[in-house]
Amino acid sequence: MTMSIERYRTVTGTSEGIHRELASKFIARAFPIANEAEFKRIAERFGNEHPASRHMCYAWVLGDAGDHHRANDDGEPSGTAGLPILRRIRSLDLTFCGVAVVRYFGGTLLGKPGLIQAYGEAARLAL
């Protein structure tokens, strides 16, 4: 009988990053996860810590090969929040990892390029 050992990269603990863009504040939290249900529990707690935030966008990657993923923009324009977060996770070849980002709106619209940059940078700082 042969046994294979799968190897993958993940985060070993929880970490945070804060990014400010104009007057908006983006707080990102990265954390290890075993499954989607665990991600939902952790992300919900994170969101509850920031009840005044305008959005909580996220992405997660699961599976030894990182073949299961999800990204969510939570009301931001399509593709401007969840996908940049997912790209940051993928850029490090991580799996069994989730990143959630809350945004405190500062009164100035950032536009699609600004949102893409800000959510991606917040995720990078957390990872």
Residue ranges and their predicted role:
Residues G98-V101, T108-L127:
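Glycine- and Gly-Pro-enriched alpha-helical subdomains that act as flexible
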Residues K40, G79, L83, P113, ...:
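Short, well-ordered alpha-helical segments
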Residues D73-L109:
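Conserved interaction-surface patches within small, structured recognition/assembly domains
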Residues S53-C57, A81-L86, A123-L127:
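Glycine-rich loops and low-complexity Gly/Arg-rich segments
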Residues V61-H69, G107, G111, A122:
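Charge-rich, low-complexity amphipathic helices
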Residues M1-T80:
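C-terminal regulatory domains involved in ligand/effector binding and gene-expression control
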Residues G47, I89-L94, G120, R124-L127:
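Signal for well-folded cores of large energy- and translation-related assemblies
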